[in-house]
UniProtKB/Swiss-Prot annotation:
ATP 2 binds at residues 289-295, 330, 450, 456-458, 460, 462, 464. GO terms for biological process: circadian rhythm; regulation of circadian rhythm; regulation of DNA-templated transcription. This is Circadian clock oscillator protein KaiC. Mg(2+) 1 binds at residue 52. Keywords: ATP-binding, Biological rhythms, Hydrolase, Kinase, Magnesium, Metal-binding, Nucleotide-binding, Phosphoprotein, Repeat, Serine/threonine-protein kinase, Transcription, Transcription regulation, Transferase. Mg(2+) 2 binds at residues 294, 317. It comes from Nostoc sp. (strain PCC 7120 / SAG 25.82 / UTEX 2576). Phosphorylated on serine and threonine residues by autocatalysis. Has a 4 step phosphorylation cycle; the autokinase acts first on Thr-431, then Ser-430. When Ser-430 is modified KaiC switches to an autophosphatase mode, acting first on phospho-Thr-431 then phospho-Ser-430. ATP 1 binds at residues 48-53, 223-225, 227, 229, 239. The interaction with KaiA enhances its phosphorylation status, while the interaction with KaiB decreases it. The gene is kaiC. The lineage of its organism: Bacteria, Bacillati, Cyanobacteriota, Cyanophyceae, Nostocales. Its cofactor is Mg(2+). It catalyses: L-seryl-[protein] + ATP = O-phospho-L-seryl-[protein] + ADP + H(+); L-threonyl-[protein] + ATP = O-phospho-L-threonyl-[protein] + ADP + H(+); ATP + H2O = ADP + phosphate + H(+).
Length: 519
C-alpha cells in the first residue's frame, strides 16, 4: 500500500472514530470518509436496488486499493453465480480467490431442500466465518442477505438472537462488515423482521423509486453512530465499474472564475455580451421551438473548433444526420469537424435511460474527450417524465462538473408558450446558469419576427435591448433593437412615439455604462 493510500485509509473524524474508505464512487464523500472501522453497517433496500453489488464492491475495492483480504458470506446466490455476475464489471473474483485474498463462504440454501431438526443455531456458520477471517487475515466482511435466513426458518425470535450473536462475534474480531437486508417498501420500515434493532450502529438505505415513467436509484445514510455524514438521498447509477453515487451536496463553490472571454460565434451577440461569454460560464438559450436555439449552439461549437478547441454536442431531440444537414445549410460542416477530431456528437433519446445514467455518460465523455466547450440540446427534453427535484439535481451535476473542469457550457431550453412571456424559473435552472439568452416570436405589423435579449449575465455589462433576430443562409443575423415598440416580452408589442431628446440621453447613458464596465 502506498503512503498516500495509507493516509486515505487511516481517515479519522474529529471525534476519534476511525473510518475505512470504501473507494465506491461518491460514497466516501457522503459518509465523510467511509465506514467506521470494526463496526457493522446495515444496507437495506427493496429488490433491485444494488445491495449485493454494493457489498461485493466494498470487498473488491478493499483488495484492489489497500490489499485488504475479505470474506463474502452468501445466503442467497451460489458462489459460482456471484463469480459469474462479477465478470460484468471486470472483476476477476476467481483470481482473487486463488491468490488467497477473497473467500466466499457458501451459506445458500440446499436446492434439494433440508429438514430442520432441533433448535435453529448459527454456531457452525459463526465458527466457519471466524476461521476464514483469521486464516485470510480479513479486514472486511460482507453478508448477503440475512433476510434469506428469516425466510427459511419460522422461529423469528430465535433467528434474531443468532444474528445478534453473529454481529457480536464480528465486532470482537474487529472486522468492518456490511450486512444486506430486504425491505418491503421504498419509504416504509427500515428493514423486515426488525433487523435494524440489533444491527444499529450504521444504517444505509438504497431505493429504486418509480418517478413518472422512469426508475430512479438513490442512497441515504440514515445514521453512522459516533461520526458525521451527509443527510438526505443522493442519486446513484450502476455502471460498468459498479455503483456510482453523485454526491451533489458535497460539491463546493470553490472553482476558479476566469476573466477570459470566448466568442459565441456571432459577432453581434458577442458585442451584446460585453465581448463574449466568460470562458468557464454556463449559458442558457431559452425560447419556443424554431427560435434558433440550435443554430446558436452550432455557431458556438463551430467557433471553438475553428480556434482548435475540442467540443462535444449532447443532442436529445435530433439525429446526427439531421443536425449535420441543418448545420450545413448554415455553412457549418459538422462531419468535417468530427473527422478532424475536434467535434464529437452524441445523440440519444432522453427516455433511453435515467437522468443519473445520462449524467454519468456526460461526465465520462468529458473525461475521455477533454473538450473546452460542451452543448446540451435540449434540457427540456431531459425534463420530460421526471420530478423537478431529479431534474434540478441533474442540472447541478452537469454544471458543477463543467465548472470544475473549466469548460464553457451552452444549454438550450424549449418553452411551452409559442408567443408572449414565459417563465424561465419554473424549470429550476435559471439561478444555476451564468448567462441567459431569451429568444421569442414577436408579431409586428401582421408579420412574425424573432427577438433576442441578453436577459442575464453574471459579472459583466450586457446589452439590455430587445433586438430583432433573423435566420439567414449564413446563420443568425441580429439587427437593431425594437426602438419604437414596447411590451415586446409580454407578446403584445405596442408602437410608441419617440422622444428624440430622451432617446439621445438613453444612448449616452448606455455608452457611459459600457465604458465604466470596460475600465
Amino acid at each position: 500500500m502506498s503512503e498516500k493510500e495509507q493516509q486515505e485509509q487511516q481517515n479519522t473524524s474529529g471525534n476519534g472514530v476511525e473510518k475505512i474508505r470504501t473507494m465506491i464512487e461518491g460514497f466516501d464523500d457522503i459518509s465523510h470518509g467511509g465506514l467506521p472501522v470494526g463496526r457493522t453497517t446495515l444496507v437495506s433496500g427493496t429488490s433491485g436496488t444494488g445491495k449485493t453489488l454494493l457489498s461485493l464492491q466494498f470487498l473488491f475495492n478493499g483488495i484492489s486499493f489497500f490489499d485488504e483480504p475479505g470474506v463474502f458470506v452468501t445466503f442467497e446466490e451460489s458462489p459460482s453465480d456471484i463469480i459469474k455476475n462479477a465478470h460484468i464489471f471486470g472483476w476477476n473474483l476467481q483470481r482473487l480467490i486463488n491468490e488467497g485474498k477473497l473467500f466466499i463462504l457458501d451459506a445458500s440454501p440446499d436446492p434439494e431442500g433440508q429438514d430442520i431438526v432441533g433448535n435453529f443455531d448459527l454456531s457452525a456458520l459463526i465458527e466457519r466465518l471466524q476461521y476464514a477471517i483469521r486464516k485470510y487475515k480479513a479486514k472486511r466482511v460482507s453478508i448477503d442477505s440475512i433476510t434469506a435466513v428469516f425466510q427459511q426458518y419460522e422461529a423469528v425470535g430465535v433467528v434474531r438472537r443468532e444474528i445478534f450473536r453473529l454481529v457480536a462475534r464480528l465486532k470482537q474480531l474487529n472486522v468492518t462488515t456490511i450486512i444486506t437486508t430486504e425491505r418491503s417498501e421504498e419509504y416504509g420500515p427500515v428493514a423486515s423482521f426488525g433487523v435494524e434493532e440489533f444491527v444499529s450502529d450504521n444504517v444505509v438505505i438504497a431505493r429504486n423509486v418509480l418517478e413518472g415513467e422512469r426508475r430512479r436509484r438513490t442512497i441515504e445514510i440514515l445514521k453512522l453512530r459516533g461520526t458525521t455524514h451527509m443527510k438526505g438521498e443522493y442519486p446513484f447509477t450502476i455502471t460498468n465499474d459498479g455503483v456510482n453515487i453523485f454526491p451533489l451536496g458535497a460539491m463546493r463553490l470553490t472553482q476558479r472564475s476566469s476573466n477570459v472571454r470566448v466568442s459565441s460565434g456571432v459577432k453581434t451577440l458577442d458585442g451584446m455580451c460585453g465581448g463574449g461569454f466568460f470562458k468557464d460560464s454556463i449559458i442558457l438559450a431559452t425560447g419556443a421551438t424554431g427560435t434558433g436555439k440550435t443554430l446558436l449552439v452550432s455557431k458556438f461549437l463551430q467557433n471553438g473548433c475553428v480556434n482548435n478547441e475540442r467540443a462535444i454536442l449532447f443532442a436529445y431531440e435530433e439525429s446526427r444526420a439531421q443536425l449535420s444537414r441543418n448545420a450545413y445549410s448554415w455553412g457549418i460542416d459538422f462531419e468535417e469537424l468530427e473527422s478532424q477530431g475536434l467535434l464529437k456528437i452524441i445523440c440519444t433519446y432522453p427516455e433511453s435511460t435515467g437522468l443519473e445514467d445520462h449524467l454519468q455518460i456526460i461526465k465520462s465523455e468529458i473525461a475521455y474527450f477533454k473538450p473546452a466547450r460542451i452543448a446540451i440540446d435540449s434540457l427540456s427534453a431531459l425534463a420530460r417524465g421526471v420530478s423537478n427535484n431529479a431534474f434540478r439535481q441533474f442540472v447541478i451535476g452537469v454544471t458543477g462538473y463543467a465548472k470544475q473542469e473549466e469548460i464553457t457550457g451552452f444549454f438550450t431550453n424549449t418553452t411551452d408558450q409559442f408567443m408572449g412571456s414565459h417563465s424561465i424559473t419554473d424549470s429550476h435552472i435559471s439561478t444555476i446558469t451564468d448567462t441567459i439568452l431569451m429568444l421569442q416570436y414577436v408579431e409586428i405589423r401582421g408579420e412574425m419576427s424573432r427577438a433576442i435579449n441578453v436577459f442575464k449575465m453574471r459579472g459583466s455589462w450586457h446589452d439590455k435591448g430587445i433586438r430583432e433576430y433573423n435566420i439567414t443562409a449564413d446563420g443568425p443575423e441580429i439587427q437593431d433593437s425594437f426602438r419604437n415598440y414596447e411590451r415586446i416580452v409580454s407578446g403584445s408589442p405596442t408602437r410608441v412615439s419617440i422622444d428624440e431628446k430622451a432617446e439621445l440621453s438613453r444612448i449616452v447613458r448606455r455608452f457611459e455604462d459600457k465604458q465604466g464596465s470596460d475600465s
